[in-house]
């Protein structure tokens, strides 16, 4: 796919999926030949097409292992590493960025990973229309765009209405794991999650980084800039 074709695909996607305020932008980035080849050859095995009807995740994965939703995986490096570290857990990874989708599929193939399925779609629509209540054992959202300008804060993904959409999909005892390198956003995340009676913080405030989460490029970048990194892990109690 050429840059022009990729950009046209993104423009078509935006036209077909209008929403007043989005937490992401469709970056017009170059799709490498290897990334496009991965999409062309591996999507049928590891990709899931969006449908506006409830999905059977066990059927999609061919297993009844625990299911983790990962929203916004970037280039997929951390996602592939987490899946490698947790082979008895299935990961549904969602992003709208074409090169990232292609790269994650490439990593799945190179690392012989059977426990990842990939979607290229708006996560909000997937949550609303495809995921059944009580179908998830965990949710990972690592380094979402902080939209640091105050006038853009309304675009931040982690807000109460979004968490309210997620909670019914999470099993009792399931968890939400967030991470950010933006301190003010970390405070907002803590405030939002703490506002739900059905969620219990696993730490006094911010959690130690779990062993399964590798350092991402965003985390490394933040550390180089002198930023801290904050993990939050909350469990659903009921």
Curated annotation (Swiss-Prot):
Give yes or no: UniProt keyword tRNA processing: yes
Q: Which residues form the active site?
A: 145
Q: In which pathway does it act?
A: tRNA modification; N(7)-methylguanine-tRNA biosynthesis
What's in the keyword line of the UniProt record? Methyltransferase, S-adenosyl-L-methionine, Transferase, tRNA processing
Signal sequence extent: none
Q: Does the keyword Iron apply?
A: no
Protein function: Catalyzes the formation of N(7)-methylguanine at position 46 (m7G46) in tRNA.
Protein name as catalogued: tRNA (guanine-N(7)-)-methyltransferase
